[in-house]
């Protein structure tokens, strides 16, 4: 096959090992698996509109999916008592204009999840997942275990910048080890429009205008991106229209028409919302991180 056709390929044995571990963790908790890849949507597919690729199906233009998380959220919202959570294995298409070799994949597999509860429950669950996979915990003097983490603004101050870049993620490994929880992202980093905002205490400059978002950095790369979802319908609509200075919504309107996009948004906002959280795991990066930590079997 031509080299181009190898884009996004993952070793089958590595893929089987990692997805089996992840499925075991979530099914033990009673989660249900969803197949979002065959579902058509605009909003549920688009995470970064600047990297959208499209296709024509039945005379309509659709985005190649970048995430399945809103479909997991849909399953949770339409029947809240059915399961404690949902997960899926999906393919993310990112038409990166300037991909960094070894860091950016333009097509890659993801494992995504949705749980009940807010950012505190999310952080606990992700810590449990990493421990289940085998990533080493740190230990306090009193015997309690933990993974290193801090708020985005604190880390930015530490490195003397406003926005963290790839080199700062790499530095986190040197400073703190293989796992770091980066939390509470400022709104100027353009968190996704349905992420919950930190509202208390607003008098704290540290938490002002920040989203309840956690990126788990594994061996210097963002490997899990996650957040608490918003329950505020008006705030979600406002964020949708204003993130990236309005560029996010305008790109979607230009590509798929304002009528279609607004119809999907209106339909989503009809749900009765409750505290919930979710995230996506880049499988190629998780495989990389597991190999670097000696958590993958040696090649046969």
Where are these regions (language model features)?
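A translation/RNA-centric and nucleic-acid-associated enzymatic feature enriched
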Residues: 50-117, 149-300
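Flexible helix-coil linker/hinge segments at domain or subdomain boundaries
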Residues: 134-147
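Short, conserved charged micro-motifs
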Residues: 119-124
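Short amphipathic C-terminal alpha-helix that caps PH/PH-like domains
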Residues: 125-134
